[in-house]
């Protein structure tokens, strides 16, 4: 166990002798023994002993000491005002953080100030907006040994549950949601989570079926969870959320009423994009920088105006649809918004004024929202009628837009309550007054009037006293220690009236008060204190009334999110000349297809067609490196993803089948941490494809067998081609440098050859990036190597060897070097297989080193 966690041994040994404050700290460390306890002392959060040493090291802050009758303890603290950035650092270092706040004012405490853990901060249970990405969900997952999977975003209340068949399915599903933390039960697999996911073993009792079912029903009522594994996962996840919620600063348990809707789903209802496909197609993260920062599909599509829309878009991308009717409904909505430019632009302008409604109402429900949050919520709800008006016409042309419009509820009573109760520009603090609007509460107005009248009397006092005493230099002032006073300089002390009572002596003056001034001051203080208390009570009451409308506000938030995504997709379609695809076609038919990301970064992008009928679903694609093979295959795959997302696609015309899965085998890389070579990684990915691909799959293969010898590589490539043709029947795009494979494809009845042509010029090779029927005539590998800067001697020798092979029809292994030595079999194959678009500078240097060593 980490020494920074749990009760400090040095304190535990002297538990009976510790001061009350350190005893309180020790008790909290025992209760939250899996977290670093940040213990509020005044304006700082303090840590002690081993926790202090760890905190000081990680946060690079000073390690001090606290002396006590029982000894001296290391201590390190952080200012409360900057706590969030420090907490983020502790989370990044792999720690959970229990924040223990003072839940009563120090001046109100009769003895030891009461403290309670108001929140347990973990990577998966964050609710602090400054620590969360606006456009991304922050999920905590829970996995059971029966492959029950539940996911919860504590910041929004989004909750999902499903049951998976096997470990591989778990890994794929986790790739979809990318949880920041995973809660696992006894015997559950733990090797399927990403490197950035904190794995948290949780207490066995939370996974017991009866307790889990009771908890699930308490949150969601009678549920449609189909298996015990799902119930256990969901129940345990809710238990973990309860553990992390802590208490409010009022000492009350933080409610989680906003977690009220459970989405039970079947992964088979959505297109499966596994981890390899998501990375290869650059759905969320770019593998290369195409001259544009953030060049991934999601950024290309993300014209959303709100955080709600940004998260919804990513959810749609995680789960493209398989149901043709649902896809068509989305496409109908996008088309209606494409055609109604003015309505769409007005809606987008108003969506830009929308705050994060989901996280706002969640904060309200948890009792964490301040007055500014309520004003932001009111401001967002006030936009809703205008959004609804933008859809008056379009809703008649789209069932989905009609549904969105119907669900856009401006919650009039909530808006009016907030507007009536909360001032327009409230302060950050909600306990120090200035939050509730005048006229909202009669008693509060009376107290404020008393306060104002008293201060007005004091404002006039200085002039009155100067006139009464004849002391022109007399001043009336105030400070936090002595309150209100009348100050008279030493030369004028003889003129001080008898009713002046001394309050403070200074070097050059005396400060006094009068009975009437004291009385007025007491009235002001009493009015201020009672007004602050009453104002906070009224604010909490308003917040609770707003919280009662949580479900209505959440439904509006979901409708706003959908509208934002549909407007974004329509904007992209209109701006970049996308077309509406035909769904559920019997083949892939695309005219003028383009890559949605690459076309934005290249001024002369060349569109290409695709013609793959169901009767000939396999295409073998040849051509030199840099000719466009990889980009072309990815754009076909992305066209399918976009179609099933419900988006228009970058093409003149497009008709595609509905694919239940997209497989990719693109590029080459070692898995050093996993102890796997490039070739082993490649074969593992290929095995997954061949095991699962069928007639409803789209397979993209960019070189197979490149990580081994030429003969072995070709044998694997041919066997793969034949298997995909004869057994799987999947729609397949197979790019290869094995030109012999084109002869195989020519003999297969359900396969076609395509190629990207190139021509030799005085400057090397010229690519036209046009896809054409038939096989390529040459690979131009030597020419591309020359363009890449391979040493002239290597290029010349390779050209000489290639010429000899062509004239003698000699295989690479039989060609001899000029000095009678034997040329390594892989030399020419490596040159031909160099893919400049995939090669980093370091890889290029390593390649040159290998070639030189082979020649030597």
From Swiss-Prot:
One of its GO terms (biological process) is mismatch repair. InterPro entries: DNA_mismatch_repair_MutS, DNA_mismatch_repair_MutS-lik_N, DNA_mismatch_repair_MutS/MSH, DNA_mismatch_repair_MutS_C, DNA_mismatch_repair_MutS_clamp, DNA_mismatch_repair_MutS_core, DNA_mismatch_repair_MutS_N, DNA_mismatch_repair_MutS_sf. ATP binds at residues 623-630. Keywords: ATP-binding, DNA damage, DNA repair, DNA-binding, Nucleotide-binding. One of its GO terms (molecular function) is ATP-dependent DNA damage sensor activity. This protein is involved in the repair of mismatches in DNA. It is possible that it carries out the mismatch recognition step. This protein has a weak ATPase activity. Belongs to the DNA mismatch repair MutS family. This is DNA mismatch repair protein MutS. It comes from Natronomonas pharaonis (strain ATCC 35678 / DSM 2160 / CIP 103997 / JCM 8858 / NBRC 14720 / NCIMB 2260 / Gabara) (Halobacterium pharaonis). The lineage of its organism: Archaea, Methanobacteriati, Methanobacteriota, Stenosarchaea group, Halobacteria. The gene is mutS.
